[in-house]
């Protein structure tokens, strides 16, 4: 199934935007792992709406664990959690019942499912499905942290404004935990304020903006992953593209490598405390599909939120006539902001899956 992921742990997300709940099933977690539910809630709060620069829709997003967790520890059985959808307004989508929203999955989903799919809030294509992903990511991060592996992300670009990038060789440098407690997820607060200003301007204009999320993973040894189709990049990318709105991904120097010479792009090896490292990290922590022991650094690009208030051209699928559409509902003027913990969660689940297969 397309909603399943993983080789050593099996992750399944389920539900729809305006269904009674969304949820996650995780199979293969080691037994006896301590899981702090309050830390999970801290993670979930980073994704919540209700802020000036996000959707007004705000859910509590408190997971209900149905099985797999007992006395604060994993039992070794499949772990299942659901998150109730309480703040829903299907009436916002009545005028779009037969009119596909531009750049949403409405039309191809209509063709695939013959119109039987739930289109309220995007149904199974909604960003609401990232809530259960964040539950899985929060659990994965706690397990990884005990192995000395840490994951963090920030909004590196939005509306043409750039944040300070991670140091590719030492991305943590004391900022990982700070990022996870910030209301707006940038390293540079001044850049964050400029981004917020631009996002609010777009919102006021009934428009939206895109952005880029940068993610880093530290503490991984060399040799994880597989060559060719099982590469570490492939596995991370597959998971990241499961987040709605992602348009591209790059590792290390990424597409700028195309403009470099080999002498500039190559990362010379060195010894640090008798451990093989590289002087630079243009490869982003992965070479030949295998982790190199350097931090994994990647960036995911998000398109502007397609749900905008401006009139847009579309087609009535019942009458097969062109029409104009004005989208109602509650939407993010920049989905990249709330996607930061989602990217982090996706990376954490993927890395845990690789680590457990070592």
PLM feature segments, named:
Residues 1-358:
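Generic N-terminal targeting/processing segments that precede catalytic cores or assembly contacts
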């Amino acid at each position: 199934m397309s909603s399943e992921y993983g080789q050593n742990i099996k992750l399944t997300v389920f539900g729809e935007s305006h269904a009674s709940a969304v949820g996650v099933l995780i199979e293969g977690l080691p037994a006896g792992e301590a899981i702090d539910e309050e830390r999970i809630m801290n993670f979930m709060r980073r994704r919540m709406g209700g802020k000036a620069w996000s959707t007004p829709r705000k859910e509590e997003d408190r997971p209900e664990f149905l099985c797999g967790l007992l006395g604060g520890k994993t039992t070794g059985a499949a772990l299942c959690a659901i998150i109730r959808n309480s703040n829903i307004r299907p009436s916002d989508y009545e005028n779009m019942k037969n009119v596909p929203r531009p750049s949403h999955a409405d039309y191809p989903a209509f063709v695939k499912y013959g119109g039987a799919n739930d289109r309220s809030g995007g149904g199974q294509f909604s960003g609401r499905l990232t809530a259960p992903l964040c539950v899985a990511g929060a659990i994965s991060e706690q397990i990884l942290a005990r192995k000395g592996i840490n994951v963090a992300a920030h909004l590196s670009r939005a509306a043409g404004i750039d944040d300070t990038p991670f140091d590719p060789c030492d991305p943590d440098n004391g900022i990982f935990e700070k990022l996870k407690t910030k209301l707006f997820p940038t390293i540079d607060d001044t850049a964050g304020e400029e981004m917020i200003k631009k996002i609010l301007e777009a919102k006021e204009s009934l428009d939206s903006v895109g952005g880029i999320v940068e993610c880093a993973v530290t503490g991984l040894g060399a040799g994880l992953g597989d060559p060719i189709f099982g590469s570490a990049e492939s596995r991370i990318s597959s998971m990241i593209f499961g987040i709605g709105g992602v348009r591209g991904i790059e590792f290390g120097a990424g597409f700028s490598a195309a403009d470099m010479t080999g002498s500039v792009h190559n990362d010379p090896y060195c010894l640090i405390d008798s451990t093989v490292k590289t002087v630079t990290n243009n490869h982003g922590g992965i070479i030949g599909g295998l982790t190199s022991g350097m931090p994994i650094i990647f960036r995911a690009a998000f398109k502007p939120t397609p749900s905008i208030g401006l009139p847009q051209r579309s087609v009535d699928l019942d009458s097969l006539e062109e029409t104009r559409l004005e989208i109602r509902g509650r939407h993010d003027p920049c989905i990249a902001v709330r996607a930061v913990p989602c990217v982090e969660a996706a990376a954490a689940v993927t890395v845990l899956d690789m680590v457990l297969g070592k």
